[in-house]
């Protein structure tokens, strides 16, 4: 087995793992002989027992042998021009691969133990587990519990790749086009303005404004954060303009806000920032090079960017035509192992290709997800990668916490806090100012500004490269990394602060002036529809028909509210009475003239947003019925507890409607189909009430069994219906003689329903309660 080691790691002090201390036998030797040269000595075990030594600098005499303890010994003589001689011996222990594996195994066990403790604890505290992982990284690093940090960091970066891949899977082509507006209209402007602002703050060189402020406030050393050149200022400014995709996207996913316009704007900006890393990585070597003289860097930058964009386009087209076909072929084998392996290969392969093109690997992972977003395999792919994504992303947050140099933090904490505050304030103000120009409300702009005001993980890449090329001094590099890491840790709190600021602005602004005066009827007791998307418009049309009201009016009077200006504008063109504003806030409803709504229909899709709206409106209007959309049974129970009068399991009603059409197509009478649908809906409400009473949130379905005993005379249509519904077992053993007559009456179209066993009713989906009449 070939064995190699870098002797440059050896120093005349306690050595790293796997090496002994260099032994000096002469006080006349000023430096360790084996680290004077930058060349890397390499040992390799040959065919025989002999060992060859390469690139060993100025050694005149070389002698190497291998003993039975698998330890390399070497002896060298170094002759100086003065004729002095020194002789040095060193022993190097070869770190075996087993040691590396053991270290990774120990680190893995440590991380899994931390995950088991942190995630439940922070869920109980109702805090984001991201913070728990971050502080765990700080603690583990301080106590030296992570043995192989370099390899762990490499492994943790896969978590970001899986996160971006999953985000790509959630995007359709239409949503990608919508994101382009935010990416280029808002993201590009944000990167340019933030870079310019931070650069101006760091100029002029050797006397920057920021340096003078820190000296005045905290008496900091002039050389601590002093900028030496314009190039250095541009690099720092551009790196600080980036935000953290990993922290922000994970937070939005936890809150269920990715599908919202606020989430789309945030995602669009983050995608543009990923693309912006490319010119940064191209410019840095150019800035460091001393050979370009007065030549412009723009031709080189344009050339590299064009090459990268062309390669990205080829990758997109190739993936569109070949990637889907590959998944089809593997899926036909029905091998779960091969399918999971293909998912991992797709993420890794596209990431490597985009890295080779000059883009970030995360952009490649996102692109792969977007290419598979509209295939039939999306659901299975998400299910397969979710465990990998969750654990590896947690590992990334742990390794982020290990990046803090605690010695520098404690020594320079006033400067750290000042730089941290300046970073958050400048980015928040710039992003908030840009938002309304691309169609966001001031409230949404404030939220996006706070959420993206932290630094990003790509700043580590830029700072590291700049430091390695000599563009950024080491002390300033450590300080900036601390600032970026702390800002990333504050992301959950920045999100909460942005939400509170948006709420404050929403209450301070006069909603009556915002939403206009286009409603020409009394809305004080009208039905309120909150969220006027497609479902809201269908409901509005349903309420407008004369058949739903026995008065002289054309249907029931209603008023709609929506925060999307485009939706409001288009709906008004179609004649809908809709106002601009957040209808989930009582102050907005009261300003619009709604004092005692006849009913409130909440058409939001997000779970958390819907529940919060129900809670606020129930407190403000205790006598008004409130109806809402539930995503699943636990959400329905949560809405009921929050004060909703009734709720709809929207996905289940679709299943019931499709099932009804299926049975009708099989020839089942429409009355029988309607009866069956009613049984399901009523049984769902019964179990929901039982779940609420028992305070349970079990989303599973109980097997539904209908009992009908001693049926001696049943119509032909009923017999046919029973034959078609094999999953519903009809029992005829446990009922009295009246049951047959009741079933016969219902089959003949009478109103008396049959008895059903409440304890065995299957309820997963469908309308609950009185909302079954409001079909979407």
Swiss-Prot record:
FT transit peptide: 1-72
GO molecular function per UniProt: antiporter activity
Membrane-side (Stromal) residue stretches: 115, 175-181, 254-266, 318-338, 411-415, 467-468, 548-776
Keywords: Antiport, Chloroplast, Golgi apparatus, Ion transport, Membrane, Plastid, Potassium, Potassium transport, Thylakoid, Transit peptide, Transmembrane, Transmembrane helix, Transport
Domain of life of the native organism: Eukaryota
Residue numbers spanned by region Disordered: 728-776
Record has Iron-sulfur as a keyword: no
InterPro entries xref list: Cation/H_exchanger_TM, Na+/solute_symporter_sf, NAD(P)-bd_dom_sf, RCK_N
Induction (record text): Up-regulated by low K(+) stress.
Major location (coarse): plastid
Domain RCK N-terminal: 524-649
Gene Ontology annotations of biological process type: calcium-mediated signaling; chloroplast organization; nonphotochemical quenching; photosynthetic acclimation; positive regulation of photosynthesis; potassium ion transport; proton transmembrane transport; regulation of cellular hyperosmotic salinity response
One cellular component (GO) term of this entry: chloroplast
Activity-pH dependence: Optimum pH is 5.8.
Regulation: Regulated by a mechanism involving lumenal C-terminus region; a fine-tuned balance between photoprotective energy dissipation in high light and a maximum quantum yield in low light involves a reduced activity under high light.
Membrane-related topology note: Multi-pass membrane protein
Swiss-Prot/TrEMBL catalytic activity: K(+)(in) + H(+)(out) = K(+)(out) + H(+)(in)
Pfam families the UniProt entry points to: Na_H_Exchanger, TrkA_N
Membership in a protein family: Belongs to the monovalent cation:proton antiporter 2 (CPA2) transporter (TC 2.A.37) family. KEA (TC 2.A.37.1) subfamily.
Protein name: K(+) efflux antiporter 3, chloroplastic
Species name: Arabidopsis thaliana (Mouse-ear cress)
């Amino acid at each position: 087995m070939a064995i190699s080691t870098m002797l440059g790691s050896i120093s005349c002090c306690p050595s790293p793992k796997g090496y002994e201390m260099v032994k000096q036998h002469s006080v006349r030797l000023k430096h360790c002989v084996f680290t004077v040269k930058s060349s890397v000595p390499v040992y390799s075990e040959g065919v025989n027992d002999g060992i060859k030594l390469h690139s060993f600098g100025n050694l005149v005499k070389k002698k190497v042998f291998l003993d039975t303890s698998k330890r390399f010994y070497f002896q060298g003589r170094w002759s100086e021009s003065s004729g002095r001689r020194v002789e040095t011996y060193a022993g190097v222990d070869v770190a075996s691969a087993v040691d590396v594996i053991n270290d990774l195994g120990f680190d893995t066990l440590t991380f899994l133990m931390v995950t088991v403790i942190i995630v439940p604890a922070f869920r109980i505290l109702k805090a984001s587990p991201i913070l728990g992982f971050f502080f765990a990284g700080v603690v583990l690093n301080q106590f030296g519990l992570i043995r192989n940090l370099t390899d762990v960091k490499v492994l943790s970066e896969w978590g970001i790749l899986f996160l971006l891949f999953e985000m790509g899977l959630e995007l359709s082509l239409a949503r990608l086009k919508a994101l382009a507006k935010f990416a280029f209209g808002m993201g590009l402007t944000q990167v340019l303005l933030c870079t310019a602002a931070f650069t101006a703050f760091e100029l002029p060189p050797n006397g920057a404004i920021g340096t003078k402020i820190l000296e005045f406030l905290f008496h900091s050393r002039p050389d601590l954060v002093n900028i030496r050149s314009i190039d250095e200022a541009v690099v720092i400014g551009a790196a600080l303009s980036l935000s953290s995709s990993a922290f922000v996207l994970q937070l939005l996913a936890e809150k269920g806000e990715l599908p919202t316009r606020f989430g789309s704007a945030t995602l669009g900006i983050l995608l543009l920032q990923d693309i912006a890393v490319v010119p940064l990585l191209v410019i840095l070597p150019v800035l460091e090079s001393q050979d370009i003289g007065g030549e412009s860097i723009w031709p080189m930058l344009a050339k590299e960017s064009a090459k990268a964009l062309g390669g990205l386009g080829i990758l997109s087209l190739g993936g569109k035509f070949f990637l889907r076909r590959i998944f089809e072929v593997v899926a036909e084998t029905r091998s779960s192992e091969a399918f999971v392996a293909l998912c991992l290969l797709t993420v890794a392969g596209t990431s490597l290709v985009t890295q080779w093109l000059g883009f970030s690997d995360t952009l490649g992972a996102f692109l792969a997800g977007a290419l598979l977003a509209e295939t039939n395999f999306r659901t299975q792919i998400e299910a397969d990668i979710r465990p990998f994504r969750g654990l590896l992303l947690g590992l990334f947050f742990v390794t982020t916490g290990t990046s803090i140099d605690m010695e520098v933090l404690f020594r320079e904490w006033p400067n750290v806090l000042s730089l941290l505050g300046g970073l958050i304030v400048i980015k928040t103000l710039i992003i908030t100012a840009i938002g309304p120009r691309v169609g966001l409300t001031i409230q949404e702009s404030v939220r996006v500004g706070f959420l993206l005001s932290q630094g990003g993980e790509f700043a580590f890449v830029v700072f590291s490269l700049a430091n390695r090329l000599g563009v950024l001094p080491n002390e300033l590099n450590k300080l900036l990394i601390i600032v970026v890491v702390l800002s990333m840790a504050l992301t959950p709190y920045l999100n909460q602060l942005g939400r509170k600021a948006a709420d404050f602005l929403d209450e301070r602004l006069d909603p009556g002036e915002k939403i206009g005066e286009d409603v020409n009827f009394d809305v004080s007791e009208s039905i309120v529809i909150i969220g006027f998307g497609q479902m809201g418009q269908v409901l509005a049309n349903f309420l407008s028909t004369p058949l739903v009201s026995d008065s002289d009016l054309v249907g029931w009077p209603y008023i709609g509210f929506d925060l999307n200006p485009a939706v409001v504008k288009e709906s008004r063109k179609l004649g809908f009475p809709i106002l601009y504003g957040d209808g989930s806030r009582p102050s907005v409803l009261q300003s619009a003239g709604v004092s005692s709504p006849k009913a409130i229909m909440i058409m939001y899709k997000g779970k958390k947003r819907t529940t919060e709206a129900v809670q606020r409106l129930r407190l403000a209007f205790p006598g008004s019925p409130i109806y809402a959309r539930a995503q699943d049974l636990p959400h329905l129970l949560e809405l009921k507890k929050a004060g909703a009068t009734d709720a709809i399991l929207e996905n289940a009603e679709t299943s019931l409607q499709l099932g009804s059409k299926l049975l009708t197509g099989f020839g089942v009478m429409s009355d029988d189909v309607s009866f069956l649908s009613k049984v399901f809906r009523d049984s769902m409400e019964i179990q929901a009430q039982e779940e609420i009473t028992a305070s349970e949130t079990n989303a599973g379905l109980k097997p539904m069994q209908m009992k009908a005993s001693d049926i001696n005379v049943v119509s032909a249509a009923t017999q046919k219906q029973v034959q078609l519904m094999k999953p519903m077992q009809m029992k005829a053993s446990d009922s009295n003689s009246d049951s047959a007559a009741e079933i016969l009456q219902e089959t003949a179209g009478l109103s008396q329903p049959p008895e059903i066993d409440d304890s065995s009713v299957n309820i997963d989906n469908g309308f609950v309660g009185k909302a079954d009449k409001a079909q979407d």
